[in-house]
């Protein structure tokens, strides 16, 4: 295996973008490597495949694909393409090899020195790998950079996840006045806040 890895590294050092080591004993290994996102072999690249970054207009379709199942099951509030396009500058994403696996948005309320962390989504196949924590750190960093002293979330299902990360429950009337006006009392979302 060491020999093959060194050959792959040499290939990448000489301009090959990606080189693969495939198990010869698996029938159809080449097809699985090409057509399944995670593949079946070992890939050596001369670049970072995973990135945490701010979203751009090119990411709107990927964000919609990611959040749509969670909107349908009621975990997330429905967002239209137009809303995401309008607010794209608020979103941060985790992508792997061009596919968006997680996202979150920061909606600042500067008059109250707080911001809402919204649309927090990690794809089921990526859950448990730390992408949610990466996004939380990014949102906290962005909030600090613009002078916010806290962030808050509204959640109906993930309260325990946020509490484990330093959030505490507060009543809905804690929300900034502008956010209270939009609060959907029928959803019965829990309001959690974290001081930065």
Q: What do these predicted regions represent?
A:
Residues 1-78, 82-83, 128:
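C-terminal catalytic "cap/lid" subdomain
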Residues 17, 149, 168:
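Short acidic/polar active-site loop segments enriched in Thr and Asp
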Residues 78-122:
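A conserved beta-strand-loop-helix scaffold within acyl/acetyltransferase catalytic domains
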Residues 122, 128-145, 153:
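Conserved acetyl-CoA-binding loop-helix of GNAT-fold acetyltransferases
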Residues 152-154, 163, 168-191:
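Conserved catalytic-core motifs of GNAT/GCN5-like acyltransferases
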Residues 193-196:
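Short beta-strand-to-coil "C-cap" segments at the C-terminal boundary of structured domains/repeats
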